[in-house]
């Protein structure tokens, strides 16, 4: 399987981060070549502390911190800039999109689609 980056912009999502991380790692457990790239967009609710805990306990998890809120577009742009994997998937931190959809997205990439 090709390598995957999942970019997750975060703004004051401390309540959902551990569950999101748990679900993402479960979904991606069959592929050791992935990274979870959380971009903290100036959160003020302690999200960065939770993200740092997750990063310290899981080498697949990377964190970038913005010191003020620049917006989702800036967070995504930064994620795309630093990603080094074959496929890039974006996901909201609030679990609005089920992490299980990642496999469908990757399958579409493997069929030759550039944007899903």
What are these regions (language model features)?
Residues 1-116:
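Structured catalytic core of nucleotide-sugar glycosyltransferases
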């Amino acid at each position: 399987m090709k390598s995957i980056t999942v970019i997750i912009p975060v703004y004051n999502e401390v309540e959902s981060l551990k569950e999101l991380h748990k679900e993402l790692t479960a979904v991606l457990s069959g592929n050791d070549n992935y990274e979870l790239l959380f971009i903290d967009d100036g959160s003020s609710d302690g999200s960065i502390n939770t993200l740092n805990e997750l990063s310290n306990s899981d080498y697949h998890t990377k964190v970038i911190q913005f010191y003020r809120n620049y917006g989702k577009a800036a967070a995504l742009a930064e994620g795309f800039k630093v990603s080094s994997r074959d496929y890039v998937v974006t996901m909201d931190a609030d679990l609005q999109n089920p992490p299980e959809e990642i496999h469908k997205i990757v399958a579409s990439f493997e069929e030759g689609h550039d944007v899903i």
